Amino acid sequence: MIFKGVRDGKPYPEHGLSYRDWSRIPPRQIRLDELVTITTVLALDRLLSEDSTFYGDLFPHAVTWKGICYLEDGLHRAVRAALRNRTVLHARLLDLDAVTQHADQA
């Protein structure tokens, strides 16, 4: 299996990050087999499109919640990486566990 799991919808609370907020998070490598997708459907035209990264962020967005890493945006990029036999993906990772822990301590 390419991903750790596939589910429909976000199990974590809304984080409210804008694209500008996401752009401030530096990309890092994430193993594909550690990701759980939150989308069950992939638009084949986005997967095959040469300019699918023309709009939006060049890096997928992932969220860690309760120790699990969820792929929030960029499923087509992750599948494309897997089709090229890559095991990792560069993505922006929001650690909601750390944000929640920090808020609880404040």
Labelled PLM ranges:
Residues 1-21:
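N-terminal leader/domain-start detector
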Residues 3-5, 27-32, 36-38, 83, ...:
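Hydrophobic transmembrane signal anchors and adjacent membrane-proximal interface regions, especially
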Residues 15-70, 82:
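Short alpha-helix boundary/capping and kink motifs at helix termini
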Residues 56-106:
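A short, basic-hydrophobic beta/loop patch
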